Every structure is written in structure tokens, then in C-alpha cells.
Amino acid sequence: MLEMAAEVGDGVILNLFPRSFFPTMLEHIRIGAERGGKKLEDIEIVCRHQVVVTADLAEARNRMRTQFAPYYATPVYNNFLAWSGHADKAKVIKEGWAERDRNKTTGAMDDQLVDELACIGSVGECQDRIREYADMGITTHIISCPSPDALQTTYEAFTAENFSF
């Protein structure tokens, strides 16, 4: 899908991917762009980032688990998670969902995976992470905060007065 979007479109929109897998995704975007007679730089790469500015890492990670484990239980996201190098976790999520075992489903998303999927931490840590994504090739950033308690703090961290590249 990344290749096709880059081949026929002028951009791609990314969501809920492990950070370490981005170089592989970028390569597929490049392949599609070139197949369409374009350069990678011609493609807008948009990302919806899950960001939580907080000191309570455990609560933020748990919120990510409960909100996004069901996404990864669906066939498309489950296959994507497996493709991105997390086949073992994708399998447990799928099994947990089929067994209607919420703890098994959410438990498969350990801290390491959650930290690959989301930017969680202090203002500076989250801002640095978004800058790293920009340096990696993401051109347009959408900040999405899955934690109602952290909305104000998170969005304030990314206002024009508080953030720039």
C-alpha cells in the first residue's frame, strides 16, 4: 500500500507503526515514488503521532495498551504488526482477542512496543522524538494525544511558541 500510494499519489499518511520499522517503510515509499517517476522528496509523508506529555509513564503506557491493542487485533493492523518485526506479539494479541481475554490482548503490548509506537515522556523528550521523526523523513506531523488528562499539556508543548524544528 505504501508503494502504491507513493506511485499514484502525492503523499502517504502513516499511523501506529513501530519507530524502528520506519526505515523499511520509507524504502517502500521510495520504491513507489520512483515507479511513478518521482523522487522520494516529492512525496509528502504525514504521520499521526500518539504523544503523551506526562511524568506518569505507566499510566500513559497502559492507556496506549487499552486503546490500541484492539486495533492490532484486526487483521490489517495485526498483519502489519507482524510484518514490522513483532510477529510474536501480533500472534498473542490475535489469540487474546479471539479468546475474549482483554488482559492477554493488552499484555502483549509490552513497554518496549508501546515506546516504539508512541512518544511518551517529558515535554523535551516528546519534542525531541518528533524532531527525530522529522530528521528521519516525516514531513508533516499530526500530534494526537490519547490521554484526556494530558491533552492540555501535550498540545501546549507543540504550539508555535513552544516548538519548532
Segments predicted by a language model, with ranges:
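Active-site-adjacent structural elements that line small-molecule/cofactor binding pockets in enzymes
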Residues: 1-165
